[in-house]
Amino acid sequence: MDRIFNMDNKFFTFMSRVADLIILNLLFLLCCIPIVTIGPAVTALYYVTMKMVRNEESYIARSFFKSFKENFKQGVAIWMMALVLILLEFMDFFIMKQLSGGIYTVVKYGLLVIALLLAMILQYVFPLLAKFYNTVKNTLRNALLMSLRHLPYTILMLLINIAPIIAMLLNTMIFSYGILAYFLLGFSTLAFANSFFLVKIFDKYIPQDENAEEEKDADDWTIEGLREELETSSEGAASDDTAASADQEVTEDDTTEQ
C-alpha cells in the first residue's frame, strides 16, 4: 500500500511530469499571445524542457520567466527576422502560381529548399539561444552549422514536429482532438521530445572536464570546444572546404553556456 502512494514511484513521477508539461504549455501559449514575443517564448520553453531532460528543473514558472526575460531582446530580433522570411516565402509561393514551364519548376524547388533550410535553422536557433550566450548573428550561424552537421537528428526532430500536423490534416477527428492536445500540452511535449536530441547534441560542445564541473556552476561554463567541434565535424567525410567554412562561421570569442 505504501508503494502505491509513494511519491517516488513511476506513476506519480509520470503524472508530475505531465502536470509540469501542462503548466509549461499554458505559460508558453500565454506569452505567445502578443505574437511578437513568440521568439522569447520558444526560447524559454526549450530552456525548461532541456532542464527537464537533465533532471535539473526546479520551479517551472520561475525558470520559464527567467529565460524569457534574459533572452527577450535577442529572441524578438530572431523571431521578427524569421517571421519576415516566412511571410516572404508564402508570398513567393502565391506569385509562383503565375509562372509556367521550366521557370515554375526551378522556382518551386528553390523555394522548397529555402523553406527547408529555414525550418532547420529554426529547429536549433531558439534552443541555442536558451542554452548559450552569443550574438544574434553567431547564434544563427551556429544553428545552420549544427543543423547540417547533425542532419539525421535534424530530420528526426522536424518529423516529430510535422507528423502531428499531417495527421490532423488527414483526419477531422484527429484534428479536433489534436487542437485540444496542442492547447493542453502539445507544444511543451514536442519541445520535451526534441530536447532529448538537443541535449545530446549540445553536450558535444560543452567541456567534459570533471574538475570544472565540480568547481563551477553549469551556468558559468565556457564552451571551449565549439570551434574545434565545428572545424572537425567533416573529418573523414567531407572536403577541406567544408571544415574551413565552419572555421569562418564560428566567432573568435568563446560561447558561454547559460
Describe these PLM feature segments.
Residues 1-111, 121-124, 128-258:
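Helix-coil boundary and N-terminal low-complexity module in membrane systems
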